[in-house]
């Protein structure tokens, strides 16, 4: 067993909801084996309040959560990523920066809870569902014997995880 800590970046377009949820989930559930980050291709500059509410209700950290541009992670000074996951279909379709470190990538697209219209209860329900889908994927990811898998096997397993319950149609096609 290794003491290596893996750097993981979650991407979506606005960096207000799904990627923020995933970052917080991995920070807590990664048990020190992972450094979690999130960013967006076109960040909105603020975190969706429903994302913060759901994370807090589930006992996940929200301090330091901020909407930021993915360019922060494409510089030579940025942490070298081991894994980069897109969690929205539009970010998966964009030309991503060249990430230092040549990370393993996968698309884990789920529906955008911030796009749900309706009552606050309906919006919160959508965020809880997104949280559940992401936590399920992250639980499987953190259980992988990363050190003992070759790159191709690891990439295939990450693709399979991305196709789990809640995957967008595009996530099933991209992977």
What are these regions (language model features)?
Residues 1-175:
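Short polar/charged helix/loop
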């Amino acid at each position: 067993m290794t003491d290596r800590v893996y750097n993981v970046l979650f991407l979506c377009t606005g960096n207000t909801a799904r990627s923020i949820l995933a970052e917080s989930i991995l920070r807590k559930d990664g048990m020190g084996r992972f450094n979690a980050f999130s960013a967006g291709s076109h960040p909105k500059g603020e975190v969706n309040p429903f994302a913060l509410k759901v994370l807090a209700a589930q006992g996940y950290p929200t301090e330091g959560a901020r909407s930021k541009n993915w360019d922060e992670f494409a510089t030579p000074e940025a942490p070298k990523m081991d894994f980069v996951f897109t969690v929205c279909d539009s970010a998966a379709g964009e030309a991503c920066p060249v990430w230092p470190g040549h990370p393993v990538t996968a698309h884990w697209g789920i529906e955008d809870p911030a796009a749900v219209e309706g009552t606050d209860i309906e919006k919160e329900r959508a965020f809880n569902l997104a949280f559940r889908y992401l936590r399920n994927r992250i639980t499987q990811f953190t259980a992988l014997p990363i050190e003992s898998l070759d790159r191709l096997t690891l990439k295939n397993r990450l693709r399979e995880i991305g196709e789990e319950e809640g995957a967008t149609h595009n996530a099933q096609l991209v992977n």
